[in-house]
Amino acid sequence: MKGIRKSILCLVLSAGVIAPVTTSIVQSPQKCYACTVDKGSYADTFTEFTNVEEAKKWGNAQYKKYGLSKPEQEAIKFYTRDASKINGPLRANQGNENGLPADILQKVKLIDQSFSKMKMPQNIILFRGDDPAYLGPEFQDKILNKDGTINKTVFEQVKAKFLKKDRTEYGYISTSLMSAQFGGRPIVTKFKVTNGSKGGYIDPISYFPGQLEVLLPRNNSYYISDMQISPNNRQIMITAMIFK
């Protein structure tokens, strides 16, 4: 099909198994932790959209199936306006609801509830852009050279810490169906999300429509299988698998 690319993924998974800059999709999660995982083999085919209209058509078709309530829609729209108002407290509490402000807790419960209706109908590739803060205080001020290129020495240190390990995001994960949304971001993650995983296309109710946004649940873990520097030396390209 025009505008859609099929990608073959071969990586290893666990056997047991961000504050935005201008919009909710660009996140810098600082309450994520990396740890070594047990590895088992995994291989499958994933759909990647390369055409905006194809992506919109697919996404809108999915959204019509959800049947979200008005309160659920409003909670998601609130999140997309400024994700830090929800993700900030969640990350600070490492995903624990205790201690959240009452108004935020109410929205968290509504968003959580919405994921009972939103699931991926097929294996799919999603993208997220991040600022250097994604790498944590150890690297965020050192990963970029003054000219905006990636510091290769620091990048090797980053790889040693995160590559071939899993990572947990305590906030919700905002992604896009297409990588073009993040051309100016220094870090771009390519997520492999499997059929049946919780997640939904929310662009029709986003405060910033047009970003082809797909929202994934909080307390999600993912395995970082690859980290590379882009050919122009201005982006770190991460490949990761979301755990169900």
Swiss-Prot record:
GO cellular component, one term: extracellular region
GO molecular function: NAD+-protein mono-ADP-ribosyltransferase activity; nucleotidyltransferase activity
Enzyme Commission number: 2.4.2.-
Role summary: ADP-ribosylates eukaryotic Rho and Rac proteins on an asparagine residue.
Enzyme class, spelled out: transferase
SUPFAM superfamilies reported in the protein's UniProt record: ADP-ribosylation
Record InterPro entries: ADP-ribosyltransferase (IPR003540), Mono-ADP_RibTrfase_C3/Edin (IPR016678)
Family stated for the protein in its record: To exoenzymes 3 of C.limosum and C.botulinum D phage, and to S.aureus ediN.
Signal sequence segment: 1-40
Superkingdom: Viruses
Disulfide bonds: none
Entry binding sites for NAD(+): 80, 87, 91, 128-131, 167-169, 182-185, 211-213
Keywords: Glycosyltransferase, NAD, Nucleotidyltransferase, Secreted, Signal, Transferase
Name the record gives this protein: Mono-ADP-ribosyltransferase C3
Organism per entry: Clostridium botulinum C phage
Domain TR mART core residues, every copy: 44-244
Record's subcellular location: Secreted
The keyword Signal is assigned to this record: yes
